[in-house]
Amino acid sequence: MSGGYALLDVGDGARLERFGDRIVERPHPAATGRRRNSDAWAAADLRWDRERGWLGTSPAQLPWSIPLDDLTLELRPTIAGQVGLFPEHAAMLPWLRERVGAVMARHGDEAADSGEAGDAGDAVSDPPVILNLFAATGLATLSLAVIGATVVHVDASRPTVAWARRNAERSGLADASVRWIVDDAPAFADREVRRGRRYGGILLDPPSYGHGPRSGAWRIDLDLAPLLVTCARLLEPDGFVLLTAHTEAFAADRLADELAAAIGRPGSRIETGPLRVATADGRRLELGAFARWSGAAS
């Protein structure tokens, strides 16, 4: 991740991060050990306290924006202690772009082989459609839109989808090929199966618990497995899945088991690992886990 974000210090149950020109302190149970930079902690602009909420920057100074690679993102403190960016997801973006690029290239080759070509002899093929469930404020959606993918962005929160659309506008992607959908992820995926839709890739970042606009409560321990089965029915044969989670009980091995059971393809190779960020001196803060699968050779 370049420019806009840095993990400055961790310790005593808290993390200190720089988002653009703002320094933010937030608690996290994995932030063990002792703090090393007392001056940096004293300079925090915003502090999240579980009892009192946000302390620091006045409302007149909000929101603010940061540059992140090809994007410009709007940040603001939320009642859940977030700011609109999950920096640990940035490490997934190179793999995502590589997978989408590979799918686009294969689609182009298939179009050329079938004789579909443009005036200059270039292959003509629709870009792959990527489904992003629990898509939040749009980091992954916009990172893929930049390289020409068509993305279906689904989140159950109308204000969060509006936030993602503002990020698209700030990033010069207001006219990108993105469908913005306010809906429950399971309900939307079920309807897409009935419609016969297929996707070149599917991203999921499910919360531990949640409530959507249509169905009842979401519980990851009960609802993830059937949703993954539905997603497997939506995948093109050479598609991919990226599953991330921040739930303590869903470490990388469990995510891999859930994904393997849903995909059900012999010989499937699933890569796993932690979602984490690191300080400049190499101390790591683990914030979740991922499992990813691709139906085509890397």
In which residue ranges do the predicted regions lie?
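Non-catalytic substrate-recognition/targeting regions of SAM-dependent transferases
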Residues: 2-87, 94
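Mobile active-site "lid"/loop adjacent to the S-adenosyl-L-methionine
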Residues: 157-160, 182-185, 199-230
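C-terminal catalytic and target-recognition region of SAM-dependent MTase-like enzymes
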Residues: 240-298
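S-adenosyl-L-methionine
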Residues: 157-201
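Conserved SAM-binding motif I beta-strand of class I
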Residues: 150-155
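Conserved SAM-binding loop of SAM-dependent methyltransferases across substrates and taxa
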Residues: 137-149
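Conserved class I S-adenosyl-L-methionine
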Residues: 126-134
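Helix-to-beta-strand junctions that scaffold the AdoMet/dcAdoMet cofactor pocket
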Residues: 235-236
